[in-house]
Amino acid sequence: MRMAVSMEDVKKLREMTGAGMLDCKKALEEAGGDIEKAKEILRVKGLAKAEKKAGRETKEGLIYVIVSEDRKKGAMIELNCETDFVARNEEFRKLAERITRHILEKDENKNKSGEGSEILSQELYDEPGKTVETLIKEAIAKIGENIRLSRYCRYDTEDYLHSYVHGGGRIGVLLDFKAPELNDQVLRLVQDVAMQIAAMRPEYVRIEDIPQEVLERERRILREQALQEGKPEHIVDKIVEGKLKKFYQEKVLLEQPFIKEEKKQVKDVIKESGLNVEIKRFCRFELGGL
């Protein structure tokens, strides 16, 4: 015969787990009134449900970024779910914040970026014994949708970091920059640069950052195109260099037309500011952009 449980305990268990009242009552009865044991029972049942949901497609979600107060370290993630409703849910945001904070505080993630699956087995920095994967599965059980950590990025710098999030978490930018000092003018400039990255999708900071094989492939394609168009051999190289300039303006941040003043390139705006700001690297995530 199952023991009677108090409604007070049922409510307490519900607050702790987010599970339904009836499920909490049954778990407490099964656990003989022991709240911790009941939590485990719900967790096991919840995680079993989470496993079933893991096959569903995750298209919505959130790009979440945290930069430390001293601007020396920062982390950004793409966390996906199935619906926009859940993406705007407070529980989902808390999960995104906790995972991002974990990446920021766990030393083994220093200056690393990659697929979310790479960090699932890590024990949480603030709760040893529990992994990132378990945290996500518990959230799946509570929220009722599949959730996936798609990718992450962690920057550590001797200089400064700046972050920018656009569209309520649809695009995020983490920017590493050098400046003699931090002041309002510098912060306005790097905010403009971060917005540029969000809007214009550059892949490299400067031309020298483009891998040689990428440049060679582009040159080869442009050369073939020019020859197929019947351009004379002696002017093909000139045509290729002209078209490469367009390629740079599309892919290279410093070569791009500045979104606030398109007659100028980003490098001109930075130089003319006289602030001695140098853009070192950036990471840009867009929801579903894998």
UniProtKB/Swiss-Prot annotation:
It comes from the Bacteria. One of its GO terms (molecular function) is translation elongation factor activity. It is found in: Cytoplasm. The keyword Cytoplasm applies. One of its GO terms (cellular component) is cytoplasm. The keyword Ion transport does not apply. Residues 83-86 are annotated as: Involved in Mg(2+) ion dislocation from EF-Tu. InterPro entries: EF-Ts_dimer_sf, Transl_elong_EFTs/EF1B, Transl_elong_EFTs/EF1B_dimer, Transl_elong_Ts_CS, UBA-like_sf. Belongs to the EF-Ts family. This is Elongation factor Ts.
